[in-house]
Amino acid sequence: GAYKLRDGQSNALFQIIAKNIYHGRYKATGVFSHPTAGDRAIDRVKDFVTVGPRAVKGELGDLGGSGYFMVLTVNADNSVTIDPSGVTPALKTDYQPNYYDPATKTFFLKYSYNTAAPRIVTEQIKLK
């Protein structure tokens, strides 16, 4: 469409953001294991948004409402690097290989935070 600048203005700044192939709405299923409260099921819809050419940001476990987020970066071999975002502390991510399956458009993840009393999350996150 046509855009009109205010009288006396001669410049405009636009931000154009491209989405990567991992950007979208996902269904997450899995388990959040708390050291004292026990296990609880993860069964929810999550939105992951582009933050880089091969990276998306979304809710960590079921804690997005508390400000816990993660950045998933899909590497050339489809392994996934998980980095903390928001209020999320350092993550332990070496329980198993974390990876993305391009055939099913699914992330397979296992990670935890709080090394003294780990909160361990195991989840599959599939594009809807």
Regions found by a protein language model. Name each.
Residues 2-9:
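Beta-sandwich strand segments
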Residues 11-128:
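Ser/Thr/Gly/Pro-rich, low-complexity flexible regions
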